[in-house]
Amino acid sequence: MEFKNKKLEQFEKDIEKKEIAVIGIGVSNIPLIDYLHEKKAEVSVFDDREEDKISKDILEKLKKYNFKCYFGKRNLDNLHGFYLIFRSPSCLPTRPELQKEADRGAIVTTEIEMLIKMCPAKVIGVTGSDGKTTTTTLTARILEDAGYKVYLGGNIGIPLFTKLNEIKPEDLIVLELSSFQLMNMNISPDIAVITNITPNHLNIHKDYQE
């Protein structure tokens, strides 16, 4: 019997015609933008860069999709009234505009968090101050050699959220996760690997404990 991802099917029903914000036009969010367009969501795109700093190909795609676009330092002034907000890892959840929307009832999440929530396969998450990429890559290769179908993602590999319709329960997902991706995440991978912890990025995190 063909496997059907019930969580994904429900999510796709929930977002149809809903107001969704995508903050940050980065590598992981472009496939997400394509996916949301395909699923007929009402999408607004936000980016701290000025419009002339965005690639012409991306701008043409957004125009073709008829998405609302907000660029520049004050782009988040227009962030209000959304059902769901996808933030890029570089857009910290501590930003007042995001906190205000969350208090209002919006779901503030990331592509990675939604992937883990709806993934039918076991997820192995690798984080730490150093050695993440090496550990993640080696883990994926070892599991592949053992005969598993492995999807490699997170900070490396490909954005996996749009692959959810392909992933089967017997597969394995290996993710490299940064501290920024883990901030405010309310779900854990099935297996968590921490390479080490040192006081990095304290210019961004409020303290070592965070």
Where are each of the predicted segments found?
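N-terminal leader/targeting and accessory segments in enzymes
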Residues: 1-110
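Phosphate-binding loop of NTP-binding sites
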Residues: 76-82, 89-210
